[in-house]
């Protein structure tokens, strides 16, 4: 097959691993910067061009689209879909997952357990928002934040009010969430491919922090997950329409809670920790599902 990887930086670990895994299985691979793609939207002859040339047909496309370029990145991916390329994750699913409010609403509707969460736009009634999620301590986040950026633990009501008031000055969308103390600064990242959790790690925050993101200095170790955690991770990914997802779970006293579903999970931390060839599993999924029948369906 001919496979395109949509990424702004082909030197990143995940891109290199996906390219290596695909080539090892005999596929042709090209890495394309989605922001350098431009599209001819034409009922007679739509096409995608890249750096002065019209791109050939690709059997499959692997989107590695950062949150900062979600709008144009998913537009480019959608054009590939309309031209009959199989997407490892569909553009509509990525857009759905990147919208934190929408994704939480969909997960809640499906009965998936979540931390108690409130979302507001520059709320005037700060005290009621805090009360709504059970009071302090609580976590305050910018809805648009990623990798632990724009996330604050407010341990008292006064601190929570101060943080929310500060965020209000940014004219931003604010997410307020109960703090799960028993998780002790750790979460479980489940890597879902299709209907299977292919690997799982526990990520724990560095001393003095509560954010477990590896980009923020968190430490990873192999996790043994329960059947319930496995099922909730798969259900969360499927609810958002994702074939590949990183599902972050908090271990609360009342059971596993889904904190976030990542549509473009990094592979470095979880592959190096577990030794699982996740990139290879993703390519195998493409091989099983990038059929002519599917491509004709999505292209239409």
Curated annotation (Swiss-Prot):
Its cofactor is Mg(2+); Mn(2+). GO terms for molecular function: ATP binding; metal ion binding; ribosomal S6-glutamic acid ligase activity. The gene is rimK. Its EC number is 6.3.2.-. Mg(2+) 1 binds at residues 248, 260. ATP binds at residues 141, 178-179, 187, 211-213. Residues 104-287 form the ATP-grasp domain. The keyword Transmembrane does not apply. HAMAP family: RimK. An L-glutamate ligase that catalyzes the ATP-dependent post-translational addition of glutamate residues to the C-terminus of ribosomal protein bS6 (RpsF). Is also able to catalyze the synthesis of poly-alpha-glutamate in vitro, via ATP hydrolysis from unprotected glutamate as substrate. The number of glutamate residues added to either RpsF or to poly-alpha-glutamate changes with pH. GO terms for biological process: protein modification process; SOS response; translation. Mn(2+) 1 binds at residues 248, 260. Binds 2 magnesium or manganese ions per subunit. It comes from Salmonella typhimurium (strain LT2 / SGSC1412 / ATCC 700720). This is Ribosomal protein bS6--L-glutamate ligase. Mg(2+) 2 binds at residues 260, 262.
């Amino acid at each position: 097959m001919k496979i395109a990887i949509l990424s702004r930086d082909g030197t990143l670990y995940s891109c290199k691993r996906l390219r290596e895994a695909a080539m090892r299985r005999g596929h042709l691979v090209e890495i394309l910067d989605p922001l350098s793609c431009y599209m001819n939207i034409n009922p007679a002859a739509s096409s995608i061009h890249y750096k002065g040339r019209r791109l050939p047909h690709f059997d499959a496309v692997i989107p590695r689209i950062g949150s900062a370029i979600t709008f144009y990145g998913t537009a480019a991916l959608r054009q590939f879909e309309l031209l009959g390329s199989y997407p490892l994750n569909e553009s509509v699913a990525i857009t759905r997952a990147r919208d934190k409010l929408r994704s939480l609403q969909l997960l809640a509707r499906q009965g998936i357990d979540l931390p108690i969460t409130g979302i507001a736009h520059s709320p005037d009634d700060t005290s009621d928002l805090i009360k709504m999620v059970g009071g302090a301590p609580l976590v305050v986040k910018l809805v648009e934040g990623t990798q632990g950026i724009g996330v604050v633990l407010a341990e008292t009501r006064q601190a929570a009010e101060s943080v929310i008031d500060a965020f209000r000055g940014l004219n931003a969308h604010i997410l307020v969430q109960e703090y799960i103390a028993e998780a002790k600064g750790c979460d479980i990242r489940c890597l879902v491919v299709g209907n299977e959790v292919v690997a799982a790690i526990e990520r724990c925050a560095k001393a003095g922090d509560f954010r477990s993101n590896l980009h923020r200095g968190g430490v990873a170790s192999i996790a043994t997950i329960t059947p319930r955690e496995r099922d909730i991770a798969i259900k969360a990914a499927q609810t958002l329409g994702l074939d590949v997802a990183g599902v972050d779970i908090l271990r609360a006293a009342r059971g596993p809670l889904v904190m976030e579903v990542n549509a473009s999970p990094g592979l470095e931390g979880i592959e190096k920790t577990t030794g699982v060839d996740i990139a290879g599993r993703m390519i195998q999924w493409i091989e099983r599902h990038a059929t002519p029948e599917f491509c004709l369906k999505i292209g239409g």
